[in-house]
């Protein structure tokens, strides 16, 4: 029997506007592709990311487009078949081969395999794909189902009827760009038999000393046997051959591996990946091969009663290690997905890992990501929370749509289930919150799934029946969570169960970020604060760059590149509550917004990680900042902008998620001297100090506190407040509570005292530092720094920063994008040199500084 032949159909593609008679075919820009990329390549539309060009290209999403190619095919042997495999068509596609319609597709997330044996020719095979407007088709579907209670946040309700990336309709951080096209590969296969699936079910003993691996291969059409090989680092671990079951077409073998090489999250161990390979045999002929990379690990979601607080925990345990899942939420890295390279995916995930993050959540309004994304997470040790693709709306549930969703879920879980990084599947993003806000029917006690379809919230059937069943069948050892946020059918804002999205800073009640300790949940899977992107990024989207007349923060073009409703008021609110700032120059305004974001996010991580208090007291098991990234150049909640330029908050999050950190909070208490007076009131400002040890070793440290007068730079206090302090592994430890150290009480001196806390090991090495300032910072009389110095070391590997008075938020800047800093936005106090690692610097590198109060 001849081996399977796979021929990529990635050459000679052309496209044209199908509903415009005089439109000519033009070559595509790349393959896979989409229509915006191809139109832009030929200069037929402007770059939608520049200026307000998004408005000029809206017609593209309402037009009809045709793609075609012509290819030759090898002979199809007797008894063999020819199949064209479409890995992804976006979205409403009619596929015609040599004049015969072979496929009608209406789901962007579904791969298709179509037998074309009887239609294929040796030469001149014409493959034509016509794409209808997803927006217009969606509008028609809405009209055809008037009894459904249509409604959503973000975009247009037509998106709810269409199985397509929901952010293409626009979101509060992204443009409306309704793409279409063959967005994933297309190839021709000729075979008598092939392997259609390969998967492994792994179980690691609680002792971690042994792992069982059950590997199953599924064959399509007749063959005899499958040879299974497992290798690690190129060395064979096991091999075995099994007969194919004549009925199911499956062959299964089980391996026991003693002393397995276990896969760990970043910082807790290595990420060894076993190669499993299946070879399909017909007699002595090797007919087909299929391989996957897997990791061996125990991964559990722990939801159990807590000591001293109501509700249940929500945290992840990997290889018996409790993981505090600090991390971030991922959106698609571009509006035009086909141009995201494998290298770019890796660079994004590497930034996450280098930022001391453990988890990334693939948000439910984008796509089931490319293999390159999950491969990078596997290799770098990043845990993945994977949403299904539903978000912020009341989805309909007619029978054909439900069947399409069932197939979508099945295909994508099968495609991704081998990745050790994926530790949870979640049914949707904020659809239960939408149900609550609109008063849609939801009775958690009612377990009659068919009855859910008759309510005004029929999507419950999708989340609690279809997706739950698919996951139970295909990934029974991976937790399934019906939504995010969700907690056992209780209100999605209940902080004592499940996960929450904490948007009462920015959205909601618009709390001060200093109150994040009162806004904690068992697992906070969204929270955030906006900041402008790098000035270079702004210049890149302004039509005239640095010379553009709209190069100021409140301009219509800059405003256009922020899609959040009410963003002007909210950015202004948090700036004016906290900082002295001015809109000019643009560079310093951008700095102020990034300082604001950095302070906000650091506050959340610092205060919430304090609630990781040890076994049985995991009051907060993780926090995922909204959001990791952007899909275009924009002002948003991201901590790294579209061009992979980290905002300053990236570094404050990195510091707070370091293996060892220290935190301080200030609390002001008013004490009347008798019951009735409002005159004689004592004001006491106290600080609380704690440390976080996320390592797996107990540490013995000294805690040193120092204080300075911010106006004079004079050191006013220096004391070891805890000597030989034991920091137990993987938890926070309370250290001290004391009054703010002042020279004279009851004269308001607390408002000018900066307090720094240090953890020092027995060799005198500094393990952690944190500088606490009076807040709000706008009240502090910041001084122009004396002798502020930021100098490259002789070998250009670091920058040394120092000053003679306390300086808030020193940011290092360099015009050269090739120069990267290991840390940034640091607070400087007298008598200390802060060393920041740098890469890409040389003798001509010029480092500049920016700080709060310089303007």
From Swiss-Prot:
Q: Where in the cell is it found?
A: Secreted
Tell me the enzyme class.
Answer: hydrolase
Q: What is this protein called?
A: Beta-mannosidase B
Q: What does the record give as EC number?
A: 3.2.1.25
- Reactions this protein catalyses: Hydrolysis of terminal, non-reducing beta-D-mannose residues in beta-D-mannosides
Predominant subcellular localization, coarse grouping: secreted
Its GO biological process annotations read: glycoprotein catabolic process; polysaccharide catabolic process
Alphabetical UniProt keywords: Carbohydrate metabolism, Glycoprotein, Glycosidase, Hydrolase, Polysaccharide degradation, Secreted
Activity-pH dependence: Optimum pH is 5.3. Active from pH 4.2 to 6.5.
- Pfam families with a match to the protein in the record: Glyco_hydro_2 (PF00703), Glyco_hydro_2_N2 (PF22666), Ig_mannosidase (PF17753), Mannosidase_ig (PF17786)
Role of this protein: Exoglycosidase that cleaves the single beta-linked mannose residue from the non-reducing end of beta-mannosidic oligosaccharides of various complexity and length. Prefers mannobiose over mannotriose. Is also severely restricted by galactosyl substitutions at the +1 subsite. Has no activity against polymeric mannan.
User: One MF term in GO for this entry?
Assistant: beta-mannosidase activity
PANTHER family per UniProt: BETA-MANNOSIDASE
Q: In which pathway does it act?
A: Glycan metabolism; N-glycan degradation
> Member of which family?
Belongs to the glycosyl hydrolase 2 family. Beta-mannosidase B subfamily.
Glycan-carrying positions: 98, 693, 730
List the InterPro entries hit by this protein, alphabetically: Beta-gal/glucu_dom_sf, Beta-mannosidase-like_N2, Beta-mannosidase_GH2, Beta-mannosidase_Ig, Galactose-bd-like_sf, Glyco_hydro_2_Ig-like, Glycoside_hydrolase_SF, Ig-like_fold
Note the SUPFAM superfamilies from the entry: (Trans)glycosidases (SSF51445), beta-Galactosidase/glucuronidase domain (SSF49303), Galactose-binding domain-like (SSF49785)
Cellular component per GO, a single term: extracellular region
The entry describes the temperature dependence as follows: Optimum temperature is 40 degrees Celsius.
Q: Provide the leader sequence positions.
A: none
Q: Where is the active site?
A: 430
Q: Look up and give the organism this protein is from.
A: Thermothelomyces thermophilus (Myceliophthora thermophila)
